[in-house]
C-alpha cells in the first residue's frame, strides 16, 4: 500500500469515527466516590443500560471534598475504583471547586464536562427522579424574580441560614404564584443534599448555555447523611466512613461495596493509608496561628466567621471541635469546614470555570474518546501536570499550582500516617486499565 493510499484510508477511518462519535451517548457523572459503594455501581450500571451510554466520563473531586474535608482515600486510588467498576475516563475536579458550595461545586463540574466537547448527558442521583422539577427550580433560582428575592431577604433577616431561607422563600413563592409544583413539593425537593446538587447542576447547565442534557436517577438505598450501615446493600458514603472510624470488620462491607473497590479500600485502611478530619488538627492550628489578622483574605471566610475565629482561637483543640465551636444557627457547620479548609490550603479566590481537564485515569478502550476530546474540547487536556505549563495560560498555570500544593499537603498527611515515601504530585502516574 502506498503512502497516499495509507493517508486516504486513515482519513476515511477518521471520518467514520467522527460520524460515529456524533451519534454516541457520552454520559458525565459528577462524583466524590468517598468511597465508592454499591449506590455508585448502581448508577454506572443504570447509565449503561437505560441511557445506552457508549462511554462514561466522571468528573471526580480530587483530594478534598465538597463538605470541606479531605477525601478518605487519595484521588488516584478512588479513580482506580471507579474505572474497575465501569467508568471509562476520570477527570479531576480541582480543589477550588471540589471544596466549594453546592453552586460552586456544580459550576466547576459542569464546566469541566462541557469543556470536553463530547459529553451529551449528565446523570445525577436524586430522591425525586423527576428531571422536569429540577429544571423548573433551576430556572427560578437563575432568574430570581423580585417577589422571590423579597421573601429571601425577609427570611435571612429572621436569622435563618441561607439554605433554610432559600427553601422557605421558594416554597412561599411557588404557592403564591401557582407554579406547576407546590410549596410542599419544593420543600421535598430541597430536603436532601443530592436534590440540591441536582438543582445546581441544572442551574449550571443553563448558565453555561451547555447542550448537555440532565437526567436524574432516583436513588436506591440509604440517604446522603444516613449513618447506619446495617440492613442496606446501598449505604451512604457517610455510613461507610463512620463504620471505618469504628474499625469494624470488613466482612460487614462485603455486600455494600463492589468487590473490586472493597479490596482496594481494605488494603488502604490496613496500611493506614487513609485521611480523616482529625489528621488536619495540627496543620490547621498552625495555619490559624500564622495567619494573624488576615483571615478574611481566604475564600469563604466572611467578616463574621473571621471574628468568631479570633474570639475562640484560644479554645482550639482540633478541626472537628473547632468547627462545632464556630457554627451558629445562621452559619452551617459545612460552611465553617470549607472556610477553614481554604485557610489551611491557602485558597483565596474562586473561579468561574475549570481552566483545564486533568486526567486521573482511563480504560484503554476509551482511547478513541480521549483523542476526540483533544480535537473537540475547549479545555487543554492534561495527562502530565509537570509538562502542563506549555499548554496553559499564566492564570491557568497558577490555578494548577494551587491545586498541586493542596494535593502535596494531602500526600504529606498520608505519608506521615502510613510511613510510605512522599511522592510529589508531578510524579504520580495515570491509572490505566
Residue ranges of each PLM-predicted region?
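Short, high-confidence coil segments that cap the C-terminus of an alpha-helix
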Residues: 51-53, 87, 118-119
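Non-catalytic positions within long, well-ordered alpha-helices that form the structural scaffold/packing
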Residues: 48-49, 83, 110, 114-115
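N-terminal catalytic cores of NTP/NDP-binding nucleotidyl/phosphoryl-transfer enzymes
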Residues: 18, 23-78
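Active-site cores that bind ATP or allylic diphosphates and position pyrophosphate for catalysis
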Residues: 92-433
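A glycine-rich helix N-cap at a beta->alpha junction
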Residues: 84-94
Amino acid at each position: 500500500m502506498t503512502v497516499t493510499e495509507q493517508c486516504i484510508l486513515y482519513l476515511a477511518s477518521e471520518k467514520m469515527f467522527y460520524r460515529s462519535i456524533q451519534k454516541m451517548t457520552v454520559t458525565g457523572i459528577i462524583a466524590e466516590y468517598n468511597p465508592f459503594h454499591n449506590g455508585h455501581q448502581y448508577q454506572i450500571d443504570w447509565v449503561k443500560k437505560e441511557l445506552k451510554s457508549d462511554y462514561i466520563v466522571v468528573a471526580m473531586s480530587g483530594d478534598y471534598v465538597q463538605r470541606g474535608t479531605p477525601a478518605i482515600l487519595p484521588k488516584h486510588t478512588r479513580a482506580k475504583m471507579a474505572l474497575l467498576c465501569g467508568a471509562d475516563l476520570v477527570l479531576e475536579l480541582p480543589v477550588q471547586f471540589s471544596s466549594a458550595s453546592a453552586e460552586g461545586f456544580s459550576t466547576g463540574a459542569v464546566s469541566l464536562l462541557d469543556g470536553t466537547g463530547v459529553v451529551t448527558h449528565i446523570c445525577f442521583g436524586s430522591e425525586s427522579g423527576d428531571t422536569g422539577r429540577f429544571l423548573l427550580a433551576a430556572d427560578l433560582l437563575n432568574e430570581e424574580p423580585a417577589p422571590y428575592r423579597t421573601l429571601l431577604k425577609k427570611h435571612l433577616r429572621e436569622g435563618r441560614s441561607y439554605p433554610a431561607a432559600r427553601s422557605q422563600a421558594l416554597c412561599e413563592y411557588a404557592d403564591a404564584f401557582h407554579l406547576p409544583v407546590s410549596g410542599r413539593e419544593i420543600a421535598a425537593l430541597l430536603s436532601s443534599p443530592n436534590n440540591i446538587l441536582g438543582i445546581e447542576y441544572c442551574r449550571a447547565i443553563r448558565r453555561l448555555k451547555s447542550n448537555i442534557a440532565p437526567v436524574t436517577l432516583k436513588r436506591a438505598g440509604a440517604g446522603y447523611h444516613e449513618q447506619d450501615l446495617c440492613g442496606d446493600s446501598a449505604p451512604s458514603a457517610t455510613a461507610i466512613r463512620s463504620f471505618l472510624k469504628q474499625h469494624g470488620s470488613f466482612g460487614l462491607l462485603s455486600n455494600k461495596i463492589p468487590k473490586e473497590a472493597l479490596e482496594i479500600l481494605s488494603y488502604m485502611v490496613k496500611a493506614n493509608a487513609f485521611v480523616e478530619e482529625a489528621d488536619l488538627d495540627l496543620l490547621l492550628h498552625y495555619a490559624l496561628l500564622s495567619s494573624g489578622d488576615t483571615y478574611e483574605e481566604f475564600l469563604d471566610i466572611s467578616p463574621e466567621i473571621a471574628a468568631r475565629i479570633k474570639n475562640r482561637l484560644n479554645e482550639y483543640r482540633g478541626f472537628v471541635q473547632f468547627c462545632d465551636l464556630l457554627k451558629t444557627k445562621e452559619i452551617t457547620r459545612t460552611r465553617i469546614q470549607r472556610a477553614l479548609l481554604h485557610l489551611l490550603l491557602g485558597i483565596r479566590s474562586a473561579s468561574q470555570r475549570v481552566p483545564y481537564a486533568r486526567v486521573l485515569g482511563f480504560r484503554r478502550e476509551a482511547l478513541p474518546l480521549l483523542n476526540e476530546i483533544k480535537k473537540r474540547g475547549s479545555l487543554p487536556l492534561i495527562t502530565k501536570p509537570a509538562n502542563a505549563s506549555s499548554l496553559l495560560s499564566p492564570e491557568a498555570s497558577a490555578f494548577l499550582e494551587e491545586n498541586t500544593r493542596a494535593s502535596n499537603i494531602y500526600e504529606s498527611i498520608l505519608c506521615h500516617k502510613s510511613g510510605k515515601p512522599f511522592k510529589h504530585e508531578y510524579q504520580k502516574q495515570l491509572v490505566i486499565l
